[in-house]
Amino acid sequence: RIMSSIVAIVGRPNVGKSTLFNRLIQRQDAIVDSQSGVTRDRHYGFSFWNGKDFTVIDTGGYMLGGEDNFEKEINHQVIIAVEESDIIIFTVDVETGLNSMDNEISKLLHKSGKQVVLAVNKVDNSKRIIDTSEFFKLGFENSFNISAINGSGTGELLDKIVQFIPDKKNIDNDNLPGFAVVGRPNAGKSS
């Protein structure tokens, strides 16, 4: 059996996480809306790039100090995704710029000890390329300017992600549980 690496897409509300998720899995699986809070639970899909496959998790937008139960549950789902992932795509929005929520999420991700790739989203013109420099303050080594909606920069982002994914290794079959099908003669064991 082969285990797949897990990549979580994390960020504050409305930065384009679900659009990026749909682009990475090459399907329109996640609902995309300009209204905040559309993605609530973790949403899973599968992706393949340069000979490596991996699971992608779309998460709801992390809310700084989420007050109501709804926001607290979304934040809890984001924390679970961070814990179960091997690699995190921290998605930020160049249109709205760096804010306190980005800083708080950044601290959370630095503490996680996971590989984090920063995706500065909505970079679809030269003016916005200049605006991306403020995100260097977040302190992530791997940063990519992307446009999830039109796909620019996502190839380079994926190239970096798959560098963190180990080559497939078979799990030791000695550690897998054994089982037997038992029963009376002609009871349908072979079926």
Language-model regions, residue ranges each:
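Polar low-complexity intrinsically disordered regions
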Residues: 1-2, 17, 127, 132
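Conserved nucleotide-binding/hydrolysis micro-motifs of P-loop NTPases
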Residues: 36-38, 61-63, 95-97, 122-126, ...
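Conserved C-terminal guanine-recognition region of P-loop GTPase G domains, centered on the G4
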Residues: 73-142
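Canonical P-loop GTPase G-domain recognition
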Residues: 114-117, 122-178
